[in-house]
């Protein structure tokens, strides 16, 4: 091979080497005031990363971790559960009792007919029940008797806060009212005051209603309780062991009934 061919091959080799090297140069380069964009085939082939995928993956991981920081890990120990509320407990509590039977929990059911956050907040009754039964988990279902209270955020906020103060550090879930009509703000108030992952918003759920048009039929209330439990597993701040029992109900370990407030 003569010298002219050797020269051409040498130039071609140098050009290919230069092209390959520059393809790994991610930010381009400048010569004499001119900017040149380098080739991207190395990144396209996955031979070099521009960092975008890694940054995206890291960001998604960080977001997932930060979104779960407020959630406690699943607690699989047996619980002593206190369930307080209004007449909605007639449908909810028997289904929760079935969950408790299956999972080794005890359940104290306390129905105060026609009660509200006002009644409970003024009475100090929750503190009395906590001192008597020593629950380590609390369910609350209140708000159904407060759908039409005017200026409710001003009128009832102190009593919601009083109840939360009585609950203290005990893990809890507050089941919101099963709206049959638009409310004046009880759900907004509860959303504002309750801790993240502790309020189950029921207003948009679908229910089969009993003849009074307000209370869900018993079968519909059982499904309501099932939805609450499922939500606790995925979105609740304090998930506990609540494996689903067969369809059906049971009876709470203790049942306490208070007549409507005067």
Residue ranges and their predicted role:
Residues 13, 19, 29, 36, ...:
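Phenylalanine-focused residue identity feature
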Residues 64-68, 72, 76, 114, ...:
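Alpha-helical context
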Residues 70-156:
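Conserved SGNH/GDSL esterase-like catalytic core that processes O-acyl groups on lipids
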Residues 1-80, 233-262:
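N-terminal secretory targeting modules
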Residues 64-65, 89-91, 182-184:
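Short amphipathic alpha-helical surface micro-motifs
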Residues 2-9, 14, 122-241, 258:
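Alpha-helical cap/lid subdomain in secreted, periplasmic
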Residues 82-118, 218-262:
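Mobile, glycine- and charge-enriched loop segments
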